Swiss-Prot record:
It comes from Xanthomonas campestris pv. campestris (strain ATCC 33913 / DSM 3586 / NCPPB 528 / LMG 568 / P 25). GO terms for biological process: ribosome disassembly. GTP binds at residues 17-24, 88-92, 142-145. PANTHER family: RIBOSOME-RELEASING FACTOR 2, MITOCHONDRIAL, TRANSLATION ELONGATION FACTOR G-RELATED. Residues 290-309 are annotated as: Disordered. Residues 8-290 form the tr-type G domain. This is Elongation factor G.
């Protein structure tokens, strides 16, 4: 089957924003104007097409990025048909992983901002993520009809807070209740959209007299930005004092693709004004897959390799989302970077070293789907029934293997225990959590060996709330959630501590006899290089002359290793200890493996108590990005949490504070940081090392244990 739309007319873009910028309403209008959605879905009554999971409709925030295909022939229907693959991304801080995941597979982005609220903290996080992947973007200042709307203020914030070179493409006509339309600076005409047709028809009018000067000034700024794209354009601009419409667009496009400028549009999605012109901007200014550099990866010999965005190149794609669909089972969303794939073809997954057959391929329109027979370079689609694919895996041709850059997912920052409410929920809970973890790599599940509890970890409290909520709704599993636990460890500080224990029982018949003398010491750096170190514990057999027969030595080691899984202080694992077996005795008849195992275990417990035992706590490496205004409060709070400041850096979003903070002090931190900084500070943390816990903490943990 031939390609219906040339790849140059594809636009794979995401709609990005913070909560309440009107992102979902904007996406809805895009679907309406591109002719996909016949009744406009309003987020206010919970019926938006893009927000298709139940909780999203209830909470009014977007959780899952749904991929949708739509077509556009321009606001005045005069363009050749362009194919849009639109990815709706969540704006809540607990879902930054979803944003990161969709940015990886996009070519461009539309950044939706609220004309009243402007650049919000979450906008800063999302902007930083877009910079990381060098995503060309344009901005849409939405909600121009709201009280307090101020277009110029938002453009200034784009420059000041995000360090963006913002270039307005329009000037609003009026604001708040008086918002009527926009001035198109390219054509120098006012655009008025027809309310009766919900904005599907429009007319050009003359610019209102009071806006002529403002528009003229804004236009020269725009033309100058375009002229800076190349020497040829700059020469023409300097000689003629102006550029043609095509020249302006080509200059602006070139600079947008290089992520040098951010063109800015405005409107009110709710009032059906402005989205249509912004879509024309997507066509004129955002890249097609062919405009982006060839995708990079490594071949089977670990050498760098690339794939061009053409149908004839070997097939390569990236799985960027896994979803469980109640009707078709597992859906794998993937972006095709090169080549062609037909339903029924086999693909190779180099990350798992497995072949998979692609059954049905679905083109998604929000949660409606259309079955298609093939996909080509630039397409975004969903495959049904791939078994071993996880988010971030590559799918490629078997004879031309390439592994595309894997997505790096942050470590979860919050954990808590979950237990099923009833016995019948037990098995279902395991299956449900497994499914959810496959869908979302930032969510982890493990069984705590010490407590036997199931521990779930994620990116924030809301993230885990929603996981528990989804278990209930989608898998009918009712669960109780507990308070998070910290994984402490135990060790000793004194060296060469001798411990002598004799396990002897004679009560008629065969008795039990095992006698060991051990020496306990903290492990040194030199000890750690020893190949016998396992689970941060070293056992050395120093017995000579058969004082203890060879066959009983493994039992001594086994007794020690079993004991260290639950330390004598509070039942946490013992780490960093070296034990030497130096002496002992045995009985010809009564000695057994069990007797030596018990003797070793008791000798260790007694010796551990004499060797200055201490409790270790996990220390997290924390990075906080905070605007200057809140720096004092944030740093004071770090000290209150027993944190040690490691240094500061500057960034466009404010100060970056690096600190080491005990994990036990970090619970509820996301919430308190948010309230301390009015939601403008963000943080990330990862485990760094274990350190001795202060006496008061150790006492509290021991009492609990």
């Amino acid at each position: 089957m031939a390609r219906t739309t040339p790849i140059e007319r594809y636009r794979n873009f995401g709609i990005m924003a913070h909560i309440d910028a009107g992102k979902t309403t904007t996406s809805e209008r895009i679907l309406f104007y591109t002719g996909v959605s016949h009744k406009i879905g309003e987020v206010h009554d919970g019926a938006a097409v893009m927000d298709w999971m139940e909780q999203e409709q209830e909470r009014g925030i977007t959780i899952t990025s749904a991929a949708t295909t739509a077509f556009w022939t321009g606001m005045d229907k005069s363009m050749p048909q362009h194919r849009f693959n639109i990815i709706d991304t969540p704006g809540h801080v607990d879902f930054t992983i979803e944003v990161e995941r969709s940015l990886r597979v996009l070519d461009g982005a539309v950044f939706v901002l609220c004309a009243v609220g402007g650049v919000q903290p979450q906008s800063e996080t999302v902007w930083r993520q877009a910079n990381k992947y060098s995503v060309p973007r344009m901005a849409f200042v939405n909600k121009m009809d709201r009280t307090g709307a101020n277009f110029d203020k938002v453009v200034e914030q784009l420059k000041a807070r995000l360090g963006a070179y913002a270039v307005p493409m329009q000037v609003p006509i009026g604001a708040e209740d008086g918002f009527e339309g926009v001035v198109d600076l390219l054509k120098m005409k006012a655009i008025h959209w027809d309310t009766a047709s919900q904005g599907t028809t429009f007319e050009y009018r003359d610019i209102p007299a009071d806006l002529v000067d403002v528009a003229t000034e804004a236009r020269s700024f725009m033309v100058e930005a375009a002229a800076e794209a190349s020497e040829a354009l700059m020469d023409k601009y300097l000689n003629d004092g102006d550029l043609s419409e095509d020249e302006i667009l080509s200059g602006l496009r070139e600079r947008t693709l290089k992520v040098e400028i951010v063109p800015v549009f405005c409107g009110s999605a709710f009032k059906n004004k402005g989205v249509q012109a912004m879509l024309d901007g997507v066509v004129h200014l955002l890249p097609s897959p062919a405009d982006r550099p060839p995708v990079q990866g490594i071949d089977e010999n670990e050498k760098e390799d690339t794939r061009d965005a053409t149908d004839t190149a070997p097939f390569s794609a990236l799985a960027f989302k896994i979803m469980t669909d109640p009707f078709v089972g597992s859906l794998t969303f993937f972006r095709v970077y090169s080549g062609t794939l037909n339903s029924g073809d086999q693909v190779y997954n180099p990350v798992k070293s497995k072949k998979e057959r692609v059954g049905r391929i679905l083109q998604m329109h929000s949660n409606n789907r259309e079955e298609i027979k093939e996909v080509r370079a630039g397409d975004i689609a969903a495959a049904v029934g791939l078994k071993d694919v996880t988010t971030g895996d590559t799918l490629c041709a078997q004879d031309k293997i390439i592994t595309l850059e894997r997505m790096v997912f942050p470590e979860p920052v919050i954990s808590m225990a979950v237990e099923p409410k009833t016995k019948s929920d037990q098995e279902k809970m395991g299956m449900a959590l497994g499914r959810l973890a496959q869908e979302d790599p930032s969510f982890r599940v493990k069984t705590d060996e010490e407590s036997g509890q199931t521990i779930i970890s994620g990116m924030g409290e809301l993230h885990l709330d929603i996981i528990v909520d989804r278990m209930r709704r989608e898998f009918n599993v009712e669960a109780n959630v507990g308070k998070p636990q910290v994984a402490y460890r135990e060790t000793i500080r004194k060296s060469d501590v001798k411990s002598d224990y004799k396990h002897a029982k004679q009560s008629g018949g065969k008795g039990q006899y095992g006698h060991v003398v051990i020496e306990l010491s903290p492990m040194t750096e030199e000890d750690r290089k020893n190949d016998s170190v396992k689970d941060d514990f070293l056992f050395i057999n120093d017995i000579t002359g058969g004082i203890i027969p060879k066959e009983f030595i493994p039992s001594v080691e086994k007794g020690l290793r079993e004991t260290i899984t639950s330390g004598p202080i509070a039942g946490f694992p013992v780490v960093g200890v070296k034990v030497k077996l130096v002496f002992g005795s045995y009985h010809d008849v009564d000695s057994s493996e069990m007797a030596f195992k018990l003797a070793a275990s008791m000798a260790f417990k007694q010796g551990f108590a004499k060797a200055s035992p201490v409790l270790l706590e996990p220390i997290m490496k924390v990075e906080i990005v905070s605007p200057e205004d809140y720096l004092g409060d944030v740093m004071g709070d770090v000290s209150r949490r027993r944190g040690v400041l490691q240094g500061q850096d500057d960034s466009p979003s404010g100060k970056i504070i690096n600190a080491m903070i005990p994990l036990g002090e970090m619970f509820g931190y996301a919430t308190s940081l948010r309230s301390m900084s009015q939601g403008r500070a963000t943080f990330s943390m990862e485990f760094d090392h274990y350190e001795e816990a202060p006496a008061n903490i150790a006492d509290a943990v021991t009492k609990k244990g």
